[in-house]
Amino acid sequence: MAQLPPKIPVAAPGHHQHWASAGGAGDAAWADEFAEFAASRRGAHRRSLSDSVAFVEVAPAGCGAGGEFDRLDDDQLMSMFPDEGGSSAPGSDNGGSDSDGGGDKHAAAQSDDGQHAAGEPTQEQAAATSPTELIRDPKRVKRILANRQSAQRSRVRKLQYISELERSVTTLQNEVSVLSPRVAFLDQQRTILTVGNSHLKQRIAALAQDKIFKDAHQEALRKEIERLRQVYQQQNTKLSGGLAADHAHVHGGPPPVRAEKELMS
């Protein structure tokens, strides 16, 4: 909160008359210019109360006079201050004296601060009133409780599912540790059987080739046997024909049919 200006001292009437006679027209012109400058500054830019008070206190000291503001009336004095003080106490501009105006400003500022504090509740008050508002709305309370229960059930289901997965993983790991040696042994046996199978395949291929050779040799032998059989039959035929001719030569001429066969042969 901005600081309020101090009360402006009020000089005695005799001192006022002495300043008016001693100051002359120069001091009066300076006071009028200062009042106009304060009014123009008031319309152009807002100043805080502390800045205005500081300016008012420094200006007379620079001029070398102690009671120059006694000549100014209440309206000119109030025009030097920004609207902050005036807005807080609108009736202070029409006060009868400087002391009364300052007191009205102070009271108005305190009442403004009290209204501001009462109009804007603090965080503690908001936190204190929030449970009451929640209790006044039973549907909202039920909805919040239902959401919390649903979230709790969901968390319980997730934890159960995770525990089941962990148990399954542990069981599978135990089975893997038990079956790993057996799998390694079977893998080694498979390698050995693969090598034996390759040897057997090579032997089967060699036997198939040998069978082909043997089949060809057997076919050649069969043809040779057939040829020898034919030769044997021819020799038997010739031998039988020669014996018959010898028998006919001994006992007489051969019969005419046999003689023709011998001629054709």
Curated annotation (Swiss-Prot):
Distribution of this protein across tissues and organs: Expressed in roots, shoots and panicles.
Claim: rRNA-binding is one of the keywords in the record: no
Stored SUPFAM superfamilies: Leucine zipper domain (SSF57959)
Gene3D superfamilies (alphabetical): 1.20.5.170
Residue ranges with Low complexity bias: 85-97
Ranges where the bZIP domain occurs: 137-189
GO MF annotation list: DNA binding; DNA-binding transcription factor activity
Subcellular location: Nucleus
Annotated keywords: DNA-binding, Nucleus, Transcription, Transcription regulation
InterPro entries in the record: bZIP (IPR004827), bZIP_RF2 (IPR044759), bZIP_sf (IPR046347), bZIP_transcription_regulators (IPR052483)
Compositionally biased region (Polar residues): 122-132
Sequence segments annotated as region (Basic motif): 139-158
GO cellular component, one term: nucleus
Region (Disordered): 1-24, 77-139, 239-265
Region Leucine-zipper, annotated ranges: 165-186
Biological process annotations from GO: positive regulation of DNA-templated transcription
Keyword Kinase tagged: no
PROSITE patterns on file: BZIP, BZIP_BASIC
Any one Pfam family match given in the protein's UniProt record, by short name: bZIP_1
Function (record text): Transcription regulator.
Identification of the protein by name: Basic leucine zipper 6
Native source species: Oryza sativa subsp. japonica
